[in-house]
């Protein structure tokens, strides 16, 4: 039987010279493998007498435990060294700038809606909302739009069924509000509206903001003052002027188209007028005591003018290259 002390010393030196786990596994095989020196020593126990065998077996087991302990110690040291090398190679330079994280932004139409609401709130208007699917009564009849009016035709209006439509304007919000509240009333009604139309300046879905002011002594002069003040502040132009051209709308009398001064000329911006007595009758307001004005502006139109966009469809094509300009 080999000298057991020699095996321990040799194994410790052998393990210490190993630089990798693969080298260590090869060294392990020389001592603990099928043909390893300790395995051979255990096989040699059969040649000993019954009296010698217990002591020799115990001695071999002690040596085996010491060899395994030396093996584990070296394996742990190699793994620790490899981990330290890996960490050193992956050191993070904390002085480098962080990766930029893309952030979202509001759609330009949403930006315009927020600005419109903020400006009108600052002069005492409340913001009112209503359903986008309206009954025939609220979208047409209560607004003095007769049954034979072209606006009721299928080529202009999206019908949900015989009695309900996708609202063609936010005027129904005003009708609901006048039914529920008593004068004086001072509101704007922003929101989505729907019409059968689509080209560079029209979309089947677009946004409107309509205004309504009902009180005892309201006049066209109040209407002009409110609209001009709003447009001057919206476009940040104190020299901006507003003019009115006679027009016709079933729900206002008199009615007018509104133009604003723009690039040396005049640009149509919306419609307006004094609330028709028939509309007041439908909502239970005494037209002898109260007067009111109403106006409507296209939100996409305001957005196009404010940001210099010449095609309405760009707002709804979801091209991030375009939309990021406004974020």
From Swiss-Prot:
PROSITE patterns: AA_TRNA_LIGASE_II (PS50862). Gene3D superfamilies: Bira Bifunctional Protein, Domain 2 (3.30.930.10). It is found in: Cytoplasm. It holds the Pfam family Phe_tRNA-synt_N. Its cofactor is Mg(2+). The keyword Endoplasmic reticulum does not apply. The keyword Metal-binding applies. GO terms for molecular function: ATP binding; magnesium ion binding; phenylalanine-tRNA ligase activity; tRNA binding. It catalyses: tRNA(Phe) + L-phenylalanine + ATP = L-phenylalanyl-tRNA(Phe) + AMP + diphosphate + H(+). It is an enzyme of class 6 (ligase). GO terms for cellular component: cytoplasm. One of its GO terms (biological process) is phenylalanyl-tRNA aminoacylation. Binds 2 magnesium ions per tetramer. Disulfide bonds: none annotated. Keywords: Aminoacyl-tRNA synthetase, ATP-binding, Cytoplasm, Ligase, Magnesium, Metal-binding, Nucleotide-binding, Protein biosynthesis. Mg(2+) binds at residue 253. Its EC number is 6.1.1.20. Tetramer of two alpha and two beta subunits. Belongs to the class-II aminoacyl-tRNA synthetase family. Phe-tRNA synthetase alpha subunit type 1 subfamily. NCBIfam families: pheS. This is Phenylalanine--tRNA ligase alpha subunit. The gene is pheS.
